[in-house]
Amino acid sequence: MTLRPSFLAAATCAALALAGCSTGAAADRQSAGDNAPSNAAYPMKASFCGQEVAVEREPARIIGAGREGVANIVSAGAADRMVARFGEHGALYGPRIEDELKSLSGIEEVASGGGEDHGSISFERVLELQADMIYGSALGEGDLSIDNLGNNGIAGVMPPSSCAYAFSGAKSDFADLDAIPAHIRELGALLNTGERANANASAMEADLAAAREEGGKLPELKAAGLYYWDSSDDLFAYGANSTIQGIFDAARLKNVVAPSYDAMFNGAISPETIVKSNPDVLIITTGESGITLEDSLARLEKIPGMTQTAAFTNKRIIELPSGAAYPTVEAIDAARELVKKLAQQ
């Protein structure tokens, strides 16, 4: 996502728009929580996925769309501006996100399930909440399309990692964990919460660097990242274009799943391909739809040959929270956790 002011008040203002240039339009901004007022320049334009969305004033009533949307709003320092959240698949966040959310009141949590029922929010409710922005991955179609939101005075903004699934021909690099703190800085500039966003982004960068440093000391092992989505026996995996791949890279794990595989586009994976690859390590993500490690292991053990793989034989089966699969601070936390667990084995 790139940002730019949509007007030029003066030459110097244009050059410093996102660094705190004050303009007459900024005087009309809405205040929200400890992050406002400020001297950021509005209106701005956010560019993402080939779209361009005008943000007329400092967002004060934000709806978090999907796990990525909610987590990034928190990381950008704007949790106190959320009026509602939806589409989160029912799993808890890690401490950095969950603790912040629990400290706040008044955020409407729209019920959402897992599996095919991703959970949504009615457009009528969006209007009732008087939202001025919906940010996140769970939008882009129907009433929640970028154009329809804009026609109703609501800025619909998506993180760049959502582009591939929302717009034909768009691409997203999920494995690039460095893009996570970079986007938080951009989001902080858009929401005028730059100080907190930059501090959180710097902490993420330090944690990621530490994970890579420690991970570089580990032996290279073959691994597969797996998960179950619902009560069926359909098994899903993480290919090369996933945050799990970025986590694997930090931990010196070689992904045995075909690089081109993407669960969103290809559906369930053949369990036999995992067995044949004989991974040294199995990473199992849990949490969404109420899926537990015990439940996942029970299903995996029914797959012919799975218990004979090196991962089962050597008891190298590691659980990560489902949040690890999303390009948020939780993926960076998971990288550190995985490196730590591998070092202990």
Predicted segments — roles?
Residues 66, 138-139, 161, 285-289:
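Short secondary-structure boundary segments
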